[in-house]
Amino acid sequence: MFQQIEQLLAQFRPCFSRKAAFGWFVTVIAGFMLRGDHLGVTSVIRDLSLSPGCYELLIHFFHSDAWDPDVIRKTWWKLLAERAPVYRVKKRCILIGDGVKQSKEAFHMAGVKKLLQESENSSKPRYIFGHMFGAVGILIGRKGGKFCAPLQMNIQDGLRAVSSWMAPVFL
């Protein structure tokens, strides 16, 4: 299994302009596969028993210009199309979409908005501050068992304001 994972991850090497960035990509993927919680970069560091000094290096990796998320996404889509047993009905693949609202404590975090909760549970507040995530995946498998392989996930609303903060700098 490790050899298959290594071969799969090697397909992403051309997506990175620096060898070190690719090494951090492999580290992050391994951390995502093994982590026991969803606390971000600290989960990866803790579950892989990395030095606490790696925290800043991982943060830098996510802001690096040595890779482009669109190139990685297209490589992932290509690998799924070539290797995965895409489940089809009448020669058409099945796409699955969903959305979730994730509460955030920070009001001034990028992309955080006031969100209406559509719930019939009266113990939940009517509004929360958080992110609205949307995801789409493709159905993979055979008649005996199927699962959804993720294609893309992003914040659905609230980032337009963030992009306006990045005004050009005049010297």
Where would I find each of the regions flagged by the language model?
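Conserved, well-structured functional cores that handle cations and Mg-NTP chemistry
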Residues: 1-171
